[in-house]
Amino acid sequence: MIFENRPLDQLKPGDHAELKRLVTADDLLVFAVATGNHNPMHLPDTDGDGDGKPDGTAPGIFLAAMISAVLGNLLPGPGTLYHKQSVEFLGHARAGDELLATVQVLEIAATGLVRLKTEVLLLPGRKVILTGEAQVKAPQKSIRFDDADLPGLIVERHRHFKALIARAKTLPPMTTAVVAPDDTPALQGAMEAFRQGIITPILIGNAAAIRKTAESCGEDLGNVEIIDSTHPAEDAVRMAREGKAQAIMKGRLHSDALLRPMMDRDTGLRTARRMSHVFVIDVPGRAHPLLVSDAAINIAPDLAAKADITQNAIDLARAIGLELPHVGVLSAVETVSPAIPSSLDAALLSKMAERGQITGGLVDGPLGMDNALDLAAARIKGIHGRVAGHADVLIVPDLDAGNMVAKLLTHLGHAEAAGVVLGATVPVMLTSRADSAMERLASAAVAVIYTDWARRQR
């Protein structure tokens, strides 16, 4: 937007300007971070005064800053400097309120100082919640300013994970075999999911080590079943086969050690579909979670494996609430090239979906990462399909590519990633020691939601 000021020689008493603003939860978070005022009374979804209700009251200075915005943008506008401001707070605003900030010129001094009446009103009733006077030094010459180059802000709130966790808490807790939870991250992750009512954990492994870990990190295991085992992965798989566990959660052991007994043809958890891992990634600024597969199990999948990988990812996307998932099959190029095998696989997967061999989603490829996610990039390259620029699910060429995509998003894109293994008789939470508490909790939530969805599809 271009702002144009009114220099001193164009001002007269009675001149008026106003600015509307809807107070959002993100506004309160940004203001708290920018000012260092972390008073919980001013944070959304936080009970700051202990009355059991969230507050989210806008700080008084936030209201005063709206006056500053009118002065700096509109009247007198760019080039204005504050000299003095008096304020009286007559009410409060909260996230979701619409406000109107107004200024009116009262007096213009020979020194170039301008006195203005300032108010902030709560709409629609126009209740005055701030009143006062400002004195500013008005600019001497005309100035036009284009704010197009100001950077945008994205608040890292991970609202999608919070929504998934809230949804999972409405479902019955899922009995989960937790394999080797004898370090703090693994044990605390399982216990937090237990406290939230998402899982009922059965801790399998070295019982003495598990109890020692619990003691060191202050976890009370009084109501939790512990199975002392020298082969916890095998025992967890056996419990799942026998129906004693509805899910498996990885603790402090290598993924290979857990996956090996799961994939045993005679005693494992195989189904007709190949097992694959799906990351559910909460990327700040996106309207919904982004799914990436496979980044953890299938190293160099062939076409048949990719078909199962794609179907597993579509099923999970539908389970978490995407009614018709848009699936972008990634390659380095957007055109089919015999020299690039991933482009051939992408084209074939698209055709398989078209012929009903993959169901439940829209599948298109090959697509580059840019034109799968960015509509403008897709249009520039002349790609006009329904998936291009709108992908909810990314199917990667191989494990290397998928792992890099997921880790770039989490470590550079400020995203958080939950993940589950599908294609087994029960979902498996393949957590990492580097996962945050939110990521571990979200993985459990996704597993519970998927299990409930799959049950209802039968």
Regions found by a protein language model. Give the residues of each.
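Short loop/turn motifs enriched for small/polar and acidic residues
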Residues: 90, 119-121, 330-332
